[in-house]
Amino acid sequence: MRSFSLPLPTLFAGFVAVLVGYASSAAIIWQAAAAAGATPGQIAGWMTALGLAMGISTLALSAWRKVPVLTAWSTPGAALLVSGLQGVTLAEAVGIFIFANALIVICGATGLFARLMQIIPHSLAAAMLAGILLRFGLQAFAGLQEHLLLCGGMLAAWLLCKALWPRFAVVAALVIGALIAAASGDVASAAVPLAFVTPEWVAPQFTPALLLSVGLPFFLVTMASQNAPGFATLQASGYTVPVSALIVVCGGLALLLAPFGVYSICIAAITAAICQSPEAHPDPNQRWLAAMAAGGFYLLAGLFGGSITALMSALPPAWIQMLAGLALLGTIGGSLFQAVHQASERDAAVLTFLVTASGVTLAGIGSAFWGVVLGGVSYGVLSALRRP
C-alpha cells in the first residue's frame, strides 16, 4: 500500500489558488446576485452552494484523473450577469442558469468542444495562458508604488527562499506579507462571523426573451472565456484530460444545483495554474495533490459562505496581488518559453499573447477567445503561404 503525503508547499499552493480565486471575483458574484434581487441571506447561500460544488467537483475530477483539475465559477460570466440580470427576478435568473448549463452539457456530450480544443496548436495555448496571467504579474509589482514595505518584503522573502529553499518561496512570501500587513495595521480588525448559511431553493422561470438575450451570451462567454482557457492551461502544463467528460460533469453539476445559486462550474485557468506549477510540487505527476488541497479549502469556504466577503475585505489587496503574482511567476515564464520556442509558430503565438493580454472585449466575449482566434487564423495563413 502506497504511503500518502501532502507536502507543505503543495498544501499552500491549494490554499493560495482558492484565496486568489475568491479574492479576485467573490465581489462580482455578490453583485450579480444582487442585480437579480437576491437578499443578503440568499447571496450567502449562493456562496455556500458554489463553494461546496467547486470543492466536490475539484476533489472528484482530480482524484479520478490524478491530474490537477481545478474547477471554478465563471468570472467573465458573472461580470456579464451583473448587467444582464438588472430588473430580472431571481426565478428568471435561475431559468437562465439552467438554460446555459444545459447548452454546456450538450456541447460536451456531442464532443464539439473537444474537437475544437484538439486543433489549437500547443504554442498558441501557451501564449493564451501567458496573456491571461500577465496582468496578475503586472498587478503584483504595481503595488510597490503605494505599499513598498509590504510588497518589497514579500519579494525579498520570495527571492531568498527561491535561492535556498525553492519549494517554500511562495509560503515564505505569504507568511512575511501577513506579518508585515498585521504589524502595519493593513488588516481590518472587524470580526468575521463564522456561520453556515443553508442555500435556498428557487424554482426556475423560463422567459424566452431572457434566455436568448442573456442565457445565450452567458453560455458563449462561459465556454470561450472560462472553459477554453481552462483546458488550454492544462494542455500548456502538459496534462491530457477527457475534455468532453469534464465539460459534461461540470455543466451537469451546475445544471442540477442551479436552483441553489450555482450559476456555473467551469474548468479553472488562472488559479489552476498555481496548482500546476513547479512550486506546487517538483513532480508533475504529484501536482494533483495541490488541486485536492484546493478542493478541501473550497469545501471549507463553502461551509462558511456567509463569511467570505467579510474575510476578503479584511485582507489588503496589495498582499493578495503580490501573492498571486509570485505564485504564477514560474507558470508565466514557462508559458512564454513554450509559446516562442518553435520559430515557425512564433509570430502567431506572439499575436495570441498580445491580443489576450490586451483585455479587449468584442461582442461580449473576452480577449482570451479572440487571442486564439487571431492566432489561429495567423497560424493557418502563415503556414499555408510562407515560403520554405
Where do the language-model regions lie?
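Alpha-helical membrane-protein architecture signal
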Residues: 8-11, 153, 212-213, 248-252, ...
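Helix-loop-helix junctions within the multi-pass membrane cores of secondary transporters/permeases
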Residues: 2-4, 10-29, 48-129, 241-329
